[in-house]
């Protein structure tokens, strides 16, 4: 029978409900940052190999698929957020039975969703890319990439849900190691398939899917072999209705929010597509570089959500509130520091991906708007993490969809439609981040804090 010992945790787990808060948040988020940066380095290797050995059309084909993939995947990945919150809260409350039911429900759900999403994405790739007005010289390669990518969706889902289980109990180091291994597989296959066998877009997609399978196998082996409350058991893999309701209550709004965010990003990508393949390539490279800042900031979002959830389950209101302020401070420092540094060295960084001067110039237009203001995105995400961590799901979804998604769409249909200028298009990002953060902060101070103050120790 699984049980918590006398306050002892596994050697890979971080105790979130006791001890100094900031060092433990940094210990939790540090491996997440390294994991995300490693993943982006491997993704960057994809883009660098394609950009230098297959030309800007192949680069545009790979770069232009991100918003479509996110649109199809985010609603289901949001359920992974719900699973992480449910597991973390039960872990903080030391309710082993409920925690294990949530874990096995989540992993069963991941398998079914991976198969369903993979089939849909494979079948609908080309029609959806047509709806996005993909340039004629890009759409064939983009459709091929999306189809191959979605063949690996079951592995992608199982890895992400398995990693969410591990993060919920404070284990962020082992997923980092597994990603290092799978990422190395990705890079080696990229070099082999693109440079040696000249498979271009197909080679990049196959390498990506292969690396996802490797990471899935490593995470599943870890969960099956671990000794403790998170051990995975095939005989327990079933859908528990109560756990499913809790996962859906938190995760579905998060997933809908992510997908509807992607709707606005698809609209932005469609607007970028109207400028031609050189602008699409520059936008894709700049976006790829921005990802290094985003992944570091997103680690604070995950830390805030997990720490708030565990301490909420443990009935510790002061630690819940201090979690927010620690994460807001850290994410501001990361966003401003990394954003300004990358903007300063933007041209040589862009040149690593593609040497064409016009591609670099187009990418720098995006960087000049996004990089100095990117910390606002981090502040917005930390507020969302705090609200989800204490059990609010509908509120952050409505605020985010209104303040970010809807505002961006209105901006594109009005301000950008009048100017048809890249800088004006990109300004929709910082404006929406600031408005959404401000509304989230007001909701937290006026509504959520009352709920937190009523907590009683478990």
Question: Model-predicted segments: where are they?
Answer:
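Hydrophobic transmembrane alpha-helices of multi-pass small-molecule transporters
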Residues: 71-74, 186-190, 216-220, 292-295, ...
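Transmembrane helical elements of multi-pass membrane transporters/channels
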Residues: 27-46, 148, 159, 182, ...
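Helix-terminus/linker motif at the lipid-water interface of multi-pass membrane proteins
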Residues: 37, 41-60, 129-136, 192-199, ...
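Small-residue-rich hydrophobic transmembrane alpha-helices
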Residues: 59-119, 156-175, 269, 282-346, ...
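Short runs within selected transmembrane alpha-helices of multi-pass transporters and secretion channels
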Residues: 80, 148-167, 175-186, 204-219, ...
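Residue-level signal for short hydrophobic patches within transmembrane helices
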Residues: 18, 22-41, 45, 68-75, ...
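Short alpha-helical transmembrane segments in multi-pass integral membrane proteins
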Residues: 1-29, 87-152, 196-252, 308-373, ...
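Transmembrane alpha-helix boundary and packing residues in multipass membrane permease domains
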Residues: 32, 36, 48, 85, ...
